[in-house]
Structure formats: C-alpha cells, structure tokens
Amino acid sequence: MKIDLILPPTKRAGYGVLESFTRDLNSAFGQIGVESRILEPSSRLISTLIRDQPDYTLSFNGILPDPEGRWLCEMVDIPHIAYIVDSPNHFLELAKQSMNVIVTIDQGFAGLFERYGAERVCFLPHAVSREVTFTHEAHPEFGWVFFGTCFDVEAIEMQWQRDYSQRVQEVLHAAASLALEDPQIFYFDAFMRSAESHGLTPAELGNLSIPVLLQSLENKIRGEDRLFLLRNLEGIPVDVFGRSIHKRGWGELLRGSSVCVHDATDYSQVKSIIRRSKGVLNSTPSIRYGAHERIFEAMAAGVGVVTSESVFLRNEFGGENFYIYGDVSSPQRAFKAEEELGGDKKESRCRAVIKHHTWIKRAEQLVAFLRVDKK
C-alpha cells in the first residue's frame, strides 16, 4: 500500500500542529512497512500524483473542493483520506464526496459525518509520538498549564441577538445548557433535541447554515466550560496560553484571578512546556467520545492531567487514573486528587498511552480499516 500525505495550506496550518501530525504519521507509516511520502500543496501536485500514483492521498483536515467545485480526488482518480482533527463543522462538505475516506478523533464527529451522508468513516483518536519519554520531574519549571483559544461568551450571545430570531436563540441557549449539563450528549444531538422541543421548523431556519449554527453553539459551550474552570482556581497558579477570536481575551476575562496569560505558542513549544510542567488542564467539552492529544502528551510524559468529561477516556483509563473536574464539587478537588496520584499510576497510564495511542498504532489501525474498506 502506498499513501501520499499532503501538507495543509499555510493559512490552515495554524500553529504547526497539522504539519507535525503529518510528519509523525509519515514516519509511522514507514515503521510499519507502508510506502509513503510528503507532498507540498503546490501547482505541481496534480502532475506529481498522476505521474506516480499512490493508493490514497491523505491530508489532516482534508482537502475541500477548489473555487470551481473540483475535488482533487476526482481530478487524479485517487481516493482521499480526510483525517479530521479539528471541529467537524468546517469540513462537513467532505461527506458529499464518495471518494473521501473520513477519519475523526471523536465518535460523535464520526456520527455527524455519517448523518451528512459520508459512507466511509473511521474513528481514530488523537495520538502522540512514541519518542515521548516519562519524565515526572520533581521540580518542574512550570506549574499547571492550560492551552486553548478564548471564546467570549457574551460576544457570542450578542452576535446571536443581532443575527438570529428569538426562537433560534432559545434553541441555541437550551442546546448549550443541555450539552454542558449532560456530558454524554454530543453537541449536535443537543441542538437537534432542543430544536425539536422548541418546535423549530426548517422554514424558520430559512437560509441559516446548520454548520455555522453548530460552530457558534460549540464556541459557546467551549467558552463557558473554559471560563468555569479557569475562574474557579481559587489561588492555584496556572499559566494560560492561547489567542482570542473576539475583542476580549484571556487577560480581560480572567482579570483578578491567579492565572498568568501568555500568547499562543507553536505546537513544538506546547509539547516542550507540557513536559516541563506539573500538569495540564484540558477543556474540550465538545470532544466527549474521543480525546485531545494534550491529554496523551501529558500522560506519556508523566505529568498531571485534569480534564473535562470524556466517555472515551473513562473507558480507556478508568475513573481512578485521571481526574475530571466535572466529577467533583470544584476544580480544586480535582487538582488535589491529581497531585496526590501515585507515581505507579502515572507510570501505568504512560505505558497505556505508549501501547495504544501512538502514531504507529494509528497507522496500523488506519491501514487495517483501509484493507477492509477495499474489499
């Protein structure tokens, strides 16, 4: 089997994470005997693929059609693997193309693509490099660290008031509350339940885009969850790294708290900071049936983890091997429980990550899926 990995366009590469994933997966393919190479998204891409055809192309977050509506997979007649590691709302158009194989990092995301018509969908959680080493430093350089975009909930709600009818606003507010109160409900399902209970009809939506509504809903959920966590630290010092998509950022929204706000940093620095920290705070309330790579990075390095609810993590690691701040009366108790977690348990979850959640494992799982899919 031969798979060509295509780097994302520069404007979508973010802080280097997609490029890093691409190189890690390419290395993993080589280690399991799959022929692969990395290609730039240049003007020569199509001719390169036609001249030396792989069995599949692969790109993190997929390749959408060009401005003229043409799909790369159709132009070169090669199936495309769209490995979605960000919110699915931006990429649901991929479900329309039958030559796309869609990989998602959350089972809820997979179900959403299937509802939009995708026929070939594979669930593979985030992963880490096998080279991550268990450090568990006695005197780490950083205390607790948090990485994440700042979402100003008030700004989101003001945009709803400006752009949506009262009924649509009520549906979105109710959906956000439902998704935050019941961590087993995926935000799309919360939206559908809320729309049904409020009697919202397709006619009332008019020309409103469902993916745009879902993205706005997800942003509100993420914003509320992150502010709940970071505003309830009660003196626990935390270094917060992240940009804002609104006028107000972390510095203004967390003024008076015990956090130290930093600019967003590139992915290589994120990994380095995690390994030099006491622990990682993780707020990903829209990933309920999967896991973010920050969690695996922290576990593999032997540092602490306090995270939002994840059914997947509970099933993988059990409730006594990491701590969820929604489980306890306050985030402080989750901090204390995680800091008191024994070194043997931290070593155990490190071994579990290295055994089950590396890029080599994901490469093996993806190849196994593709072989079954071809039959």
Please tell me what each predicted stretch does:
Residues 4-16, 20-33, 37-41, 96, ...:
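Catalytic binding pocket for nucleotide-activated donors in carbohydrate/polymer assembly enzymes
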Residues 8-9, 17, 21, 119-120, ...:
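Nucleotide-sugar donor-binding catalytic core of glycosyltransferases
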